[in-house]
From Swiss-Prot:
It holds the Pfam family MRP-L47. The modification N6-acetyllysine is found at residue 144. GO terms for molecular function: structural constituent of ribosome. GO terms for cellular component: mitochondrial inner membrane; mitochondrial large ribosomal subunit; mitochondrion. Component of the mitochondrial large ribosomal subunit (mt-LSU). Mature mammalian 55S mitochondrial ribosomes consist of a small (28S) and a large (39S) subunit. The 28S small subunit contains a 12S ribosomal RNA (12S mt-rRNA) and 30 different proteins. The 39S large subunit contains a 16S rRNA (16S mt-rRNA), a copy of mitochondrial valine transfer RNA (mt-tRNA(Val)), which plays an integral structural role, and 52 different proteins. It comes from Homo sapiens. This is Large ribosomal subunit protein uL29m. Belongs to the universal ribosomal protein uL29 family. The keyword Mitochondrion applies. It is found in: Mitochondrion. Keywords: Acetylation, Mitochondrion, Ribonucleoprotein, Ribosomal protein, Transit peptide. The gene is MRPL47. One of its GO terms (biological process) is mitochondrial translation.
């Protein structure tokens, strides 16, 4: 009885394997039991399993396309762009928004610099070069707003105007400089390196300081005279603008 039961079980297993082989195409290798264990029990379309690719052949750009302009703008002479961000607009935003906006502007700047370099290489005019100036102005305004917030927070917490404490001192050439304080391991009266610094000027330096002040005054006066001459030339060249300016003042 045991032998008959074992033979009946073997026949059922062999019939089940034959029926499973009939469902799979001839491309399946001999070890069909391994593949059948990976598939779900209810697989109406088993032939689609062999259509999958084991190797992914798409291009791995890794974000390099962000260094190039939108393909829609390729070949165009002018590209529309908005105005630059102002400090007043950026002051109304949170720190998180400013952080995100900084990286957006940085990516845009890298893209425009790549476009500018490629235009130089091909000896072609860059489409809408004012976009780069707007991005640079926006980044400068954002940096200024962040610096204002850091200064305000530091004044509130420590009362210091500068990030690193210091004092106005005079060097050996008589110039007034901002000396930044630094932490030392040993006291100042035992520190030879600190004692070599001279925060005073000898009397013979006063003559050269006077010459330097005279030089700065001459440069300033020369610049003002040049601006006045340019203004007179423009008034003679465009008299209607002078009349319009006088009427607006009245």
């Amino acid at each position: 009885m045991a032998a008959a039961g074992l033979a009946l079980l073997c026949r059922r297993v062999s019939s089940a394997l034959k029926s499973s082989r009939s469902l799979i195409t001839p491309q399946v290798p001999a070890c069909t039991g391994f593949f059948l264990s990976l598939l779900p029990k209810s697989t109406p379309n088993v032939t689609s399993f062999h259509q999958y690719r084991l190797l992914h052949t798409t291009l791995s750009r890794k974000g390099l396309e962000e260094f190039f302009d939108d393909p829609k703008n390729w070949g165009q002479e002018k590209v529309k762009s908005g105005a630059a961000w102002t400090c007043q607009q950026l002051r109304n935003k949170s720190n998180e928004d400013l952080h995100k906006l900084w990286y957006v502007l940085l990516k845009e700047r890298n893209m425009l610099l790549t476009l500018e370099q490629e235009a130089k290489r091909q000896r072609l005019p860059m489409p809408s070069p004012e976009r780069l100036d707007k991005v640079v102005d926006s980044m400068d305004a954002l940096d200024k707003v962040v610096q204002e917030r850091e200064d305000a927070l530091r004044l509130l917490q420590t009362g210091q105007e500068r990030a690193r404490p210091g004092a106005w001192r005079r060097d050996i050439f008589g110039r007034i400089i901002w000396h930044k304080f630094k932490q030392w391991v040993i006291p100042w009266h035992l520190n030879k390196r600190y004692n070599r610094k001279r925060f005073f000027a000898l009397p013979y330096v006063d003559h050269f300081l006077r010459l330097e002040r005279e030089k700065r005054a001459r440069i300033k006066a020369r610049k003002e005279n040049l601006e006045r001459k340019k203004a007179k030339i423009l008034l003679k060249k465009f008299p209607h603008l002078a009349e319009a300016q006088k009427s607006s003042l009245v």
